[in-house]
């Protein structure tokens, strides 16, 4: 399992205060640059409320203002939410998605179950027939269902 994106990321540091105040998690930041500018993709999530189109539009406006005032290159900003079949990409995401149903691959087969509890090095995975303590390092693939 890979770790979360670099917290020294300039974009992350510029928007983290806003997202923390609004109780929104930054799951992923991708930055693509070329000679004409760039594209910034940010994936956001909230456990407490739905990030619907109206809220995402407001977030886009606020984040765009912050980034345009601080970044010295032109860019396109794309915001999205994780989606129903998101591949879980970091240990932190198991904590964020605690209680959610996932498909998990440890050996060569997927099993469906729930993330009961996420800890610092492992999580409890519950299927219909068992509960397992799974270390993040043992996870080959995981995705939301």
Curated annotation (Swiss-Prot):
What's a single GO BP term from this record? translation
Q: Which InterPro entries match?
A: Ribosome_maturation_RimP, RimP_N, RimP_N_sf
- Source organism, top-level taxon: Bacteria
Where it sits in the cell: the answer is: Cytoplasm
Q: Where are the transmembrane segments?
A: none
Query: Which SUPFAM superfamilies does the annotation name?
Result: YhbC-like, N-terminal domain (SSF75420)
Disulphides:
none
| Cellular component, GO annotation | cytosol
Q: Which UniProt keywords apply?
A: Cytoplasm, Ribosome biogenesis
Entry-linked HAMAP family: RimP
User: According to its UniProt entry, what is the function of this protein?
Assistant: Required for maturation of 30S ribosomal subunits.
What protein family does this chain belong to? Belongs to the RimP family.
Q: What is this protein called?
A: Ribosome maturation factor RimP
Q: Which organism is it from?
A: Borreliella afzelii (strain PKo) (Borrelia afzelii)
Taxonomic classification: Bacteria, Pseudomonadati, Spirochaetota, Spirochaetia, Spirochaetales
